[in-house]
Amino acid sequence: MKCIYLLLLLSVGVCVSVPVESKEYNHELSELNQRESTYSTFLADTLSPFWQTKVNKGHFVNRQQLNIHYAYVKVADAQGAIVISPGRVEGYEKYQELVYDFTQQGYSVFVIDHQGQGLSSRRLTNKEKGYVEDFDDYVMDLDQFITDIVKPMHQGKLYLVSHSMGGAIGLRYVQQHPNQFSKAVFSSPMWGLNSGAIPKPIAKGIFNVVNWFTTLVTDQSPYFFGGQGYNPVEFESNQLTTSKQRYQYFRSVYVAKPDLQLGSVTFGWIRASVNAIDTAFKQLNLVKLPVMVLQAENDEVIENEAQNAFCSELAKLGNPCVNDTPIVINNAKHELFIESDKPRSEVLAKIFMFLSDND
């Protein structure tokens, strides 16, 4: 692919490729339910050529002087633009198949690599530590991305699609910037951390005390209890998906591009996430747009009860979630966008129906 690198405002580097023509999106949702049986063929004949010829990649420099990377695909005569806020550990490279599916339904798509992961700059010496000082750093990066990159290229409706940690970032974003998105989709949103048998108030106190102590002795936030560097567990032991094909492809991408690899979270990240979630739930009255919450029935990564509480509270505030409660995806693990064909196609069908509904 030939790329033209441009120097724009805020030191934006952009790799330009051919836009998707409107005539190209005639994607049948029925195809989504039978893709795994020929997944290697799909990757070689469809996804790889699409990613190489249709996807634009670039970066901008944020207020902390960090390089924030992103990718996008513009669709001619798009019915809207989807901004993807990925989960922890993720970058746009992990979203290749989802980006493809969204464009085939007529949406332009923009994906950000949050700071500290993907191809974006990492703040600690050990690049595999999951760290952020404050979730508002993520939120400000996302706003710069939307303001300086997305909106100059798309003047129509914007939709937020977020996953896991990206859901916590996305929730804080729509609370602080209520007029940017028309609708928001939250997939397995990280609105509650599993503290095990320890009551949450006590766990929060422990997190804060330990984090305070570690900041006295080092500016390199240590791994949270039991944390380690990048560890690609075998499929049989994974907590993310029941799709062996998609899991293996995701891991192969991270092997091919080691800069994407990220390990466990740090005490600093835990403190920042707990504070962000607490603030978000205190400000649910600021959520004004239509929202859909997709919940994985067998999620072992985050706490589903927090999603139930979110929709319950929004209903009391007069802005109920679609279906009034989280939409439970049966037989699905945490990563709905790389799940097996049946739950994944159900997820996409619900998203497309929600976004296309004018009510």
What are these regions (language model features)?
Residues 289, 303-313:
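Short alpha-helix in the alpha/beta-hydrolase fold that links the catalytic acid
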Residues 287, 293-295, 299:
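Short beta-strand/loop motif that positions the catalytic acidic residue
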Residues 170-260:
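Alpha/beta-hydrolase-fold enzymes
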Residues 16-61, 68-71:
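An N-terminal hydrophobic leader/cap segment in hydrolases
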Residues 79, 85-90:
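Active-site glycine-rich loops that stabilize anionic/oxyanionic intermediates
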Residues 130-150:
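Alpha/beta-hydrolase active-site loop
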